[in-house]
């Protein structure tokens, strides 16, 4: 009775329907209040249904305790989920429960605790070394199977474009004479529930291209013509895509990654056979994605001591901290190399 009196005094709702509200129902109410892009909404709902709905979703909101949330995060962590995945789920739970606090359904947000102790640390995506990059590009160039992708990879390394920006490029975006690439959209492939379609977003910048990149674009146009890949298919008002499948439709991000994985597998198989014949240890390439290609491009530019603000602009980084991380990493490696060289020098002079 004292609790009821306090609830009434503090204006905490005591309606029966409110008391029976589950976390799943609260999430539905929360999503109804949000103005979201279709792709974002589908991603949120899918994450909830796959990860939360049957785990803690049926617990009544008024009975949900911080220990429930912590135990759930611990379970995800033990199952091998990364910190980023748990944080994604937390970013769904926390605001929904905060809305319940604002609506006076509960007094405190049970998700109001640190999640830093949960989840596997994200694996650091290392850029390819100069040697690895050269070996990869040379293998592609000499391959009878993959050589048609050589211009695309040259452009990826030379521009640092995001995969979505790369596959979204149209020939209208390319100015060979001025040596510029107009980046004002990217192509994102999402399953929106009612079938798969493309979504255009707009990170806007105009980036310069090197002579090598300009030559690669010219070569890509020839390849498209020779392979009859220059058909005009329109996607959300865009047509004349630079990189397409045989159908004329733009490449998919997972398609680009699949090609990269297949090339690395083929290279490593060849390298292992060659190493056996030469009686040496095989120097395999690591499995890497289009995102690592972008990180590699950023690293090469930073290694040339490109002005950090210029590099931030070229890469389209929203925050300069992201760009600075690359510079700091390079600086750290340089310091290590100098120390090793110093030790070698001391050993030789001993």
Task: Enumerate the language-model features and the residues they cover.
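N-terminal helical hairpins
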Residues: 1-20, 34
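Short, basic (Lys/Arg/His-rich) helix/loop patches that form interaction surfaces
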Residues: 79, 83, 138-149, 159, ...
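DNA/chromatin major-groove-contacting recognition/catalytic segments
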Residues: 136, 192-198, 304, 325, ...
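Short, polar N-cap/turn motifs at the start of nucleic acid-interacting alpha helices
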Residues: 173-180, 306-326
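Proline-centered turn/helix-capping motifs that create local helix->coil transitions or kinks
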Residues: 101-110, 173-179, 217-233, 268-274
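N-terminal core-binding DNA-recognition domain of tyrosine site-specific recombinases/integrases
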Residues: 19, 31-110, 122-124, 144-145, ...
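C-terminal secondary-structure termini that scaffold catalytic or DNA-interacting sites
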Residues: 178, 191-213, 219, 223-226, ...
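Basic, Lys/Arg- and aromatic-enriched nucleic-acid-binding interface segment
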Residues: 87-89, 102, 106-169, 176-177, ...
